């Protein structure tokens, strides 16, 4: 990318939104604001999370997605990975990346500039929009049937994320601060834990616990090679399986 000056066009809705907000801008940014639906359990009290079922976790309030990413959305692991992704795509330090709860999933992300102005990208929660943007860039696809009805969405609300309810978000941010193989370890452990949850071999809360277990015991390479990443992934999977007694 750097050698050839070739742009990377993101298709994740949040990062596509940030990219679109940055087009034509030359001034430094103050922060990136990534929005978050809150997943299947955004309205569920913390004390009830211990007993949630696979079926409940798969009922995403806004998006229709595969099982793995829907579970990641319910734990906010995916949002943590999106923070990491935003850092590497846009060169933004974690301290300048904010995550806001936005239940309507209409504002896909925002960028705040040094003068206090904020640009946002809005649209219905439909992955065809960011995908078509990436495919057609720098032009836009013609979609005559796509019309946003503001009257159908009279309220757009935002709130901070409950870090106690969703510890995975801060875990991911800490992995980004540590760099090295930390995020790889988190990813490997999460994949094993999510598969176990979907297979009804562990509880929903065990997903993040398995991640914490792996991160607390895994070896760490500060300047990893490709081989180090492969080893970190294997070790994380083994540690997660060990914690879950698989």
Locations of regions flagged by a protein language model:
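Catalytic, metal-anchored helix/loop core of enzyme active sites in primary metabolism
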Residues: 3-246
């Amino acid at each position: 990318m750097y050698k050839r000056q070739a742009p990377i066009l993101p298709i994740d809705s949040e990062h596509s939104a940030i990219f679109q907000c940055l087009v034509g801008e030359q001034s430094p940014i103050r922060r990136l604001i990534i929005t978050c639906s809150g997943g299947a359990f955004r309205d569920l009290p913390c004390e009830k999370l211990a007993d949630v079922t696979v079926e409940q976790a798969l009922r995403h309030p806004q998006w229709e997605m595969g099982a793995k990413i829907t579970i990641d959305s319910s734990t906010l692991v995916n949002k943590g990975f999106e923070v990491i992704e935003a850092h590497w795509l846009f060169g933004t330090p974690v301290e300048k990346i904010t995550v806001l709860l936005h239940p309507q999933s209409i504002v896909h992300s925002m960028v705040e500039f040094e003068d206090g102005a904020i640009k946002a990208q809005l649209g219905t929660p439909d992955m065809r929009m960011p995908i078509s943007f990436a495919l057609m860039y720098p032009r836009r696809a013609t979609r005559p049937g796509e019309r946003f009805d503001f009257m159908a969405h009279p309220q757009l609300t935002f709130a901070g994320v409950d870090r106690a309810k969703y510890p995975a978000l801060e875990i991911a941010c800490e992995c980004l601060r540590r760099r090295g193989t930390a995020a790889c370890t988190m990813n490997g452990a999460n994949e094993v834990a999510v598969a176990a949850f979907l297979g009804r071999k562990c509880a929903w809360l065990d997903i993040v616990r398995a991640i914490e277990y792996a991160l607390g015991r895994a070896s760490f390479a500060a300047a990893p090679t490709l081989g180090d990443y492969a080893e970190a992934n294997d070790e994380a999977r083994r540690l997660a399986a060990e914690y879950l007694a698989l």
